[in-house]
Amino acid sequence: TGRKFSATSLGKPQYITIKYKENNLKCLIDTGSTVNMTSKNIFDLPIQNTSTFIHTSNGPLIVNKSIIIPSKILFPTTNEFLLHPFSENYDLLLGRKLLAEAKATISYRDQEVTLYNNKYKLIEGIATHEQSHFQNVNMIPDTMLRQPNKISPILESDLYRLEHLNNEEKQRLCALLQKYHDIQYHEGDKLTFTNQTKHTINTKHNLPLYSKYSYPQAYEQEVESQIQDMLNQGIIRTSNSPYNSPIWVVPKKQDASGKQKFRIVIDYRKLNEITVGDRHPIPNMDEILGKLGRCNYFTTIDLAKGFHQIEMDPESVSKTAFSTKHGHYEYLRMPFGLKNAPATFQRCMNDILRPLLNKHCLVYLDDIIVFSTSLDEHLQSLGLVFEKLAKANLKLQLDKCEFLKQETTFLGHVLTPDGIKPNPEKIEAIQKYPIPTKPKEIKAFLGLTGYYRKFIPNFADIAKPMTKCLKKNMKIDTTNPEYDSAFKKLKYLISEDPILKVPDFTKKFTLTTDASDVALGAVLSQDGHPLSYISRTLNEHEINYSTIEKELLAIVWATKTFRHYLLGRHFEISSDHQPLSWLYRMKDPNSKLTRWRVKLSEFDFDIKYIKGKENCVADALSRIKLEETYLSEQTQHSAEEDNSDLIFITERPLNTFNRQVIFSKGPPDIKVTKYFKKHITQIFYDIMTREKAEQYLIDHFCGKKSALYIESDADFEVIQAAHKLAINTKYTKILRSTILLKNITTYAEFKELILTAHEKLLHPGIQKTTKLFGETYYFPNSQLLIQNIINECSICNLAKTEHRNTDMPTKTTPKPEHCREKFMIDIYSSEGKHYVSCIDIYSKFATLEEIKTKDWIECKNALMRIFNQLGKPKLLKADRDGAFSSLALKRWLESEEVELQLNTTKTGVADIERLHKTINEKIRIIKTSDDEETKLSKMETVLNIYNHKTKHDTTGQTPAHIFLYAGQPILDTQQNKENKINKINNDRVEYEVDTRYRKGPLQKGKLENPFKPTKNVEQTDSDHYKITNRNRITHYYKTQFKKRKKNNQLSISQAPGT
């Protein structure tokens, strides 16, 4: 079927002229038309096939051709124009969508039109009644829509699902819809919202969550286009929020022009994990169904982008933040995917329709149904509902509404004038179960029915004709009356009461799913009793899915089928595929799995692993291979949404894959190299054509799991298009990597590179060195090798101390939400000089200001210099040093509107103490350096490396990136924080005293380290060291300073390339 549009406008045409080459094109302005048209292909562009229905006052019109006018030819944006001779006087018809994108304004006073910030003179055309040749595409006056005695041709279309009505019903319904035309939403209209209810996100803590996915460069223009549309609609705004949820770009079906469409999805799973559940009661389905019995008319109503018509609470707006490559945004309307969104929608509709509930209509989550016994009563009820929705400023999606139905499906039941009937789809999978013809099929069927044998009296006797066919050398005769009778009776028994029960919404639901090589199966149950069985076959693309993809597809399909039972309730999913039990903990799922995880985020469930032998019901349903005539609509729907012909993007560097294909511009050539155990193919090309791309895919990808790298997005689109043809051959997954690192070929080169960087950055630790190396270079087993190299660094062994934690229990404290909210200060002394040290807690940006003495006046002057450089914080935290506890300093800070918070006695300020320890280490390292210039400016060197060149473990960014350049920290999730805390507390119990520290009673101090570190270390000869600590000299043998070797270290002989 093609697309269906309407075209309406004012009775008198008006047009503008736009210059194209040497011609002045007459462009008709039609604010009522949802399509653009051109009388002829004056642009010499390729003609596209389409099937578009235009409804005019002269009747329906089908247009089969269109052209796509690229950007900058006529307008800054790309637009589709239907190719049809709609008029002899005009060249183009500009519809509502194009006018909206162009931010068009029409000034009748000045007689001009503004499009894309360009002004055009508005010219009055020929009146409608005088123009015989004009085909009335745009000649349906707006006034006609308001006349109750005339029917708009828009409403006569089957687009609005009115084909089942007789003439009287259609006439009266159309009159009602014309009366309430203001609540109808059409594509391109600005979406309104209600202020009846606001959605609030209450979280367990106020720690900002930050996570981000990268999306392909090829999607960037589409993403920004949709972002701009939502900004224009007022759905989102730009944001400064510390929160960030990742976005995912999901491909949709192509439009009639063949252009690929996409949908932006926000992954709110992390936010949902810390969101407090909304306990708003969900209506009892039995009570709702009880009120719908024996009605003659039913209407189901769908709100246009329902969630986006509800306003967000201002206090919760910041928590909905997300980011693209070009900006940070937050929702002003309720987005899809939030945990409590269904409950808020239910509350909102209850408040709006409360006077009408149970009498004229019912609401269940996002389903609204109007019911009555007669046509007059039903139209009256619809009018009352429309009136309430209009007052609440809500809009309807008419093409998704069903009006005046005498039989409809609602909440899994079929509503008819004769009463409520169970949905036949609940047992369709059982009724269509084919008669077993092989022993394996008999076992599967008896496993399905035998699962409920405790509810079937004399099960063994009934099943005997089938069980005896399992004996050795026993022939299976499906025409045997006893065999056929046993099969049919068992199917009947498990499809009827007392086995198949009516759902009890006070009890927990269990959804059991399974997938085989050919089909999917699922059963919804409570307390062991089945409520509904479903199964379907896999389409030609789904058969190629991996096992975990098929298993997850079964869950996605089943939750969609049983959505009216499961949405808004906690339930359990049982699966015999164990990897699904840690679905949300996968670190690198592919695009399909990630997209399906996002789809499941609106449900509240736990995944439970069960053994395969316990999953006999869903397993049997998943092994039914139905004939083509039995394929359900859901199967076809899955086929429509399938995108297995797409090459997905991965964040993994190309170098990590065993089979790598690199496309580069240059004289045509192909080079194949080996890098350790990895196979690398480098393809040089001058122009990427469809034919070349197909040959490359067949020669280098088919039958081989590979990853490719290509810089040009335009050339990648050619490969993507050719991939659809190559997919029919023996196929395995292809990924596109956007990261290509430089390969290091030998261990000697690798070690030299690590040592150089390690020394240049003042000897950072293992993790920081590994991250720094991994941003640019690749070498197999680099992490273990870097650990080995750094552990053998003599300067690190001498200058650094172990970072042990105090033995007090660690607890999370409220984190600041932005820079300059909270500073920590302390006095730092080194080599006879004193400094006021300061660190911004949010960004970890640090600075030092030298002072002559440690009194409050010097500290005040130092703080003034710090405030001039960094700005004033809201809160200043310090220990109880005499200068900081001074009443005079406190009063000065109060006058500056800065709150001073002092720690309790004998406790340090953790972040600032850790900074001091880092500075001490770096200074000791600098002292061992031969660079005299560095020694003279050591404090400046340390601060420069700390602030600008070292990524902090907590934020994942350099302090300067966040503090000076408004970058966003990459914060850990609450679960990761709790895991780290538990590990720290466990390590305190199990650690051993390092021999680098003096043996004796443990001495606790302000530092995180509970031991007193050495103050001054000197090497007396090749085997001995002298330690001076508080004027006490102790001699040690050199082995006491060496780090213990880790069990998992690689020796040089094990390293690649040696």
From Swiss-Prot:
Q: What parts of the sequence cross the membrane?
A: none
Positions of the catalytic residues: D30
Matching InterPro entries, A to Z?
DNA/RNA_pol_sf (IPR043502), Integrase_cat-core (IPR001584), Integrase_H2C2 (IPR041588), Peptidase_aspartic_dom_sf (IPR021109), Retrovirus_Pol_polyprotein (IPR050951), Rev_trsase/Diguanyl_cyclase (IPR043128), RNaseH-like_sf (IPR012337), RNaseH_sf (IPR036397)
Integrase catalytic domain residues are 810-967
Q: Which stretches make up the Reverse transcriptase domain?
A: 231-415
Q: Which UniProt keywords apply?
A: Aspartyl protease, Endonuclease, Hydrolase, Nuclease, Nucleotidyltransferase, Protease, RNA-directed DNA polymerase, Transferase, Transposable element
Q: Which GO terms describe its molecular function?
A: aspartic-type endopeptidase activity; endonuclease activity; nucleic acid binding; RNA-directed DNA polymerase activity
Entry's Pfam families?
Answer: Integrase_H2C2, RT_RNaseH, RVT_1
Catalytic activity, reaction form: DNA(n) + a 2'-deoxyribonucleoside 5'-triphosphate = DNA(n+1) + diphosphate
Which Gene Ontology BP annotations are present?
DNA integration; proteolysis
List, alphabetically, the Gene3D superfamilies matched: 1.10.340.70, 3.30.70.270, Acid Proteases, HIV Type 1 Reverse Transcriptase, subunit A, domain 1, Ribonuclease H-like superfamily/Ribonuclease H
Please share what else the UniProt entry notes about this protein. The open reading frame is located in a copia-like transposable element called 17.6.
Q: What is this protein called?
A: Retrovirus-related Pol polyprotein from transposon 17.6
Source organism per entry reads: Drosophila melanogaster
In the UniProt record, what gene is named as encoding this protein? pol
